[in-house]
Each structure stands twice: as structure tokens, then as C-alpha cells.
Amino acid sequence: MFNSAVELCEVWRGSLRESLHVGHAVVVDSSGSIVKSWGDPEQIFFSRSSSKMIQALPLVSSGAADKFGLSSQHIALACASHNAANIHTVLVEKWLLELGLSDSDLCCGPQTPRDRDAKIDLFKANLKPCRIHNNCSGKHSGFLTLTKHLGAGANYVSIDHPVQKACLEAYEMTTNEISPGFGIDGCSAPNHAFTLKGIAKAMAWFADAKSRSDTSSKSAVRIIDAMLRYPELVAGEGRACTELMRAAQGKVAPVSYTHLTLPTKQPV
């Protein structure tokens, strides 16, 4: 991986280069053809949180979102790596309550809030973080909603669970690839590996969804619209992807710990 990586970004301090960042990048058009690449577009990697919109696709396309009356706010939160500010955790709590569930039904672990005020409030109240404070609790609430819809078992993060099978199907449909394997993400859910080009194709598929009329594409449009309507729920105040979505109108920018992807319609 590192031998084929190329120089992407330099950080300078004064007149001296302080650090150099290397990696891989690829741009594809709506047909999935490579427009420009740096490094190896066939590099296999984990897209992690930047592909939560793919993981949310079965939630909408299955009819689960409509059955349980999910709003655009719920759908945006299902795609989130949020700060655990009150706007995030209150919505997750209400969502779980409407499902007849609670914090203990989430398979993600507890996590200290990234939001400063929420962190201080917990400290002042001498309370420990809960699972709703996990930055992936929105995604997991979406998983629980789909679990309820499918009448499946409680261990929705198992690789053999119908929810995770639906997620893999969504990945392979949008990337037009077969995943070579999976790993367990920090929130306990499986994350499937694909090529960089494959994930770029998936983002292009989302970006071009309005030109198609099938159920999956209509669901993708709904997901993108939800993220653009509520960028503060996708991450939070001061976060790069939230600010970028506000500034670059019409573009969705889900961020991960290692990269950021930009699904956007190519101008004609």
C-alpha cells in the first residue's frame, strides 16, 4: 500500500516543510470511468464512516424508514459520525423510545462526547457516557429500525445478520465489486473492504441517483437530501464535513478517520 502511495499534501512551517502526507485518490464520472487518479485506484481499503450513506441505503429502500415514520433528521443521523451534542443524543433517545427500545439495545459501546458542552454536563452531573453518546449511535439506531422491520434477532452487528447482509448487498451493488473481506469497525459493526475505485463508483452512483427511477436510486436521493438539509446532524458544529456541506451547496461530504469522500454531480 505504502510503496504505491504518492505525495498528496505538504505542511510548511515558515520556510521549511514540516510534514508530508502520502496516499491514494481517485475521481470517477457518473458512468464509473476514472477521470483522474493519484497512486493506486485499485488499492483495497476500508471506507469506514465515509460510506455510512451506503449502510443507510437498506433502511430506506426496504421500506423500514417509512414504516416507522422516520424523518429526514433521522436519516441524516443514520449517516452521522456525530459530536454527541444534545441535538444528536436527544434525537437518538426519542428514536429508540419510539421503537420500544433503549440505550442498552445499541451494540455500539459508550463513548465520551466530542461536544464540549455535553462532556462538561456529564462531568458536572457525575455521569458516565452512554451508548447514545457514541458517534455512531445514529447509524446503530438505523440498524435497529431495519432489524425491527425484518423481524430479525437482536445481535444486528453479526456478519450473518440480515441487516449486515443487506448492507453488504448495498455495497456490492453501488461499487459493482465483490468485497474481498471485512473488518470490525470501532463501533462493533462490520466494515467491508473495497477498492478505492469501487467506493468512488459508489459515490458517483449516489451523485447521479436523480437521473434514475428505481427504488434504490430514489432512496439514495432521499438520503442525500436529508444530509444536505441537516448537515449539523451528520457531524456537528465546527466539524469539517458539516461546514463543507454548508459552504459547497449541493455536495455531500461524509468524513472518516482516514479520508473524506465527495459525491457530487459532474457539471455538463
Residue ranges and their predicted role:
Residues K52-A56, I199, T258:
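Residue-level preference for non-acidic, small/hydrophobic
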Residues S47-A64:
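Active-site SXXK
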Residues M1-E42:
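Beta-lactamase-like hydrolase cores
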Residues E169-I178, F182, S217-P254:
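Short, conserved active-site entrance elements at the starts or edges of catalytic domains
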Residues R17, S47, I132-K139, S158-V163, ...:
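Short, contiguous, pocket-lining structural segments
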Residues M1-F2, S71-S179, C187:
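Active-site-adjacent helix/loop patches that line small-molecule binding or acyl-intermediate pockets
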Residues T258-T264:
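Conserved small/polar residues in nucleotide/adenosyl-binding loops
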Residues P190-A209, S219-A226, L260:
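Active-site-proximal alpha-helical segments within enzyme catalytic domains
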